[in-house]
Amino acid sequence: MELDECSPSIFIISFIFIAISIAILRRIRPKKTKALPPGPWKLPLIGNLHQFISRDSLPYKILRDLAQKHGPLMHLQLGEVSAVVASSPEMAKVITRTKDLEFADKPAIRAIRIVTYDYLDIAFNSYGKYWREMRKIFVQELLTPKRVRSFWSAREDVFSNLVKTINSANGKSINLTKLISSTTNSIINRVALGNVPYEREIFMELIKQLLTAAGGFKLVDLFPSYKIIHVLEGTERKLWKILGKIDKILDKVIDEHRENLLRTGKGSGENGQEDIVDILLKIEDGGELDHDIPFGNNNIKALLFDIISGGSDTSSTTIDWAMSEMMKNPQVMSKAQKEIREAFNGKKKIDENDVQNLKYLKSVIQETLRLHPPAAFLMRQCREECEIGGYHIPVGTKVFINIWAMGRDPEHWPNPESFIPERFENIPYDFTGSEHQLATFPFGSGRRICPGISFGLANVELSLALLLYHFNWQLPDSSTDLDMTEAIGIAARRKYDLHLIPTSYM
């Protein structure tokens, strides 16, 4: 009886206790979050940065090794930055094709913000109206196939001087790396800035200093909330100082172009043709852009930065590695030389069509870019929350596509570490990341694919064709081996300059 009388009270009290407990637990227990991609264990504060503490290891090799343990889509915590690394063609295709719009942004990098005049360029500007207008300028005005062909005389002239310089070595060892770098810089400068007078050597040295200071991963980008790092690192002060000197030169070059256009109505390029600055000035004056998109000197300089920094470095690095690989694989060099010398035999002057018909040389270039992509990573940033392979990718996540690792993936490339151009003989000469080429796309894919592919490849093709046509090559000091070590950094360059002895074929 006593039990019956107290039962309702006990029931009510128990119910209230349970209800309150559930409410408290709901508040305390974190909401279930969608799963991020798997990844290695993390340390407090620094996350996965300890994975990169190595004197000799290259970052893209470290990420390749981590991906072999954790999968082709991997999450890393880089200080305060949440990052995802894609290491397979399948994952890369989703990011650059299937979900291209969701990943159309580029990560914010403080050094790049400075050198591009607050992201007024195309390579690092966020996806939006301004970016679309600038890309349209590149694709429809600056680097159309017709425009690239119009630069032939400048390329021909500069490479002719290169051949003369190498001939003058008279069988002595030359630093081919420096010669090629200087040559590609000269081509880019003539195409972009024309023949107006300016301090060319000083300008290119400043560009080199700027790229060195701005390159690599900076602590300020990994710990953006720690303002003290901005002061202690000192990079920004150095960049502003260098950029101030570059500004003076470029402003003078742009003013010279304006005056020449007004005075003569002609461009400042080869034989009165328009160069890049001339075209950009006409766009500025022609009112072709929407009225809400300002376009002045800083916009022009930012676009020039993309062309000068991207064009010369990409081409020279590719040529350097192609010659290195052919020295390591003499049978490849012999086969390429045979093709070129048969095609050019008896010709006093080489034209662009002659170069375009060199199929084996193109296979050599494809194989070089597979093993040695000039940029080891493609960088993106998630602008819309989405899922990849069942994993959640939050807005703002930095994305790194490991192109270097993709090119050496044994699942897609038999004998991946071997230099075998023949593997590309039945694969179209295509670097757009299309279906048949997704196992490697060194120039990107989708909306943010490099708009200067045809221009860069034209420089690489002509340079290699002339080097292999005019000269036989050997290593200095009867060396039997060539050091192929890569430089530490995010770009896959040679660590040591390539020194070779040329002998005139003719």
Curated annotation (Swiss-Prot):
Gene Ontology terms describing biological process: indole alkaloid biosynthetic process
Transmembrane stretches, start-end: 5-25
Gene Ontology cellular component terms for the protein in this record: endoplasmic reticulum membrane
Enzyme Commission code: 1.14.14.-
Disulfide bonds: none
GO MF annotation terms: heme binding; iron ion binding; monooxygenase activity; oxidoreductase activity, acting on paired donors, with incorporation or reduction of molecular oxygen
UniProt-listed CDD domains: CYP71-like
Tissue occurrence: Accumulates progressively in roots.
Lumenal topological segments: 1-4
Pathway: Alkaloid biosynthesis
SUPFAM superfamilies hit by this protein: Cytochrome P450
Binding of heme, residues: C450
Activity control summary: The enantiomer (-)-vincadifformine acts as a competitive inhibitor.
Reactions catalysed, as given in the entry: (+)-vincadifformine + reduced [NADPH--hemoprotein reductase] + O2 = (+)-minovincinine + oxidized [NADPH--hemoprotein reductase] + H2O + H(+)
Topology in the lipid bilayer: Single-pass membrane protein
UniProt xrefs under InterPro entries: CYP450_71D (IPR052306), Cyt_P450 (IPR001128), Cyt_P450_CS (IPR017972), Cyt_P450_E_grp-I (IPR002401), Cyt_P450_sf (IPR036396)
Alphabetized UniProt keyword annotations: Alkaloid metabolism, Endoplasmic reticulum, Heme, Iron, Membrane, Metal-binding, Monooxygenase, Oxidoreductase, Transmembrane, Transmembrane helix
Required co-factors: heme
Keyword Transmembrane in record: yes
Main location class: endoplasmic reticulum
One Pfam match: p450
UniProt xrefs under PANTHER family: OS06G0641600 PROTEIN, OS08G0105600 PROTEIN
Similarity comment: Belongs to the cytochrome P450 family.
Function: Component of the monoterpenoid indole alkaloids (MIAs, e.g. echitovenine, tabersonine, lochnericine, 19-hydroxytabersonine and horhammericine) biosynthetic pathway; MIAs are used in cancer treatment and other medical applications. Cytochrome P450 catalyzing the hydroxylation of (+)-vincadifformine to (+)-minovincinine.
UniProt-recorded name of the protein: (+)-vincadifformine 19-hydroxylase
Source species: Catharanthus roseus (Madagascar periwinkle)
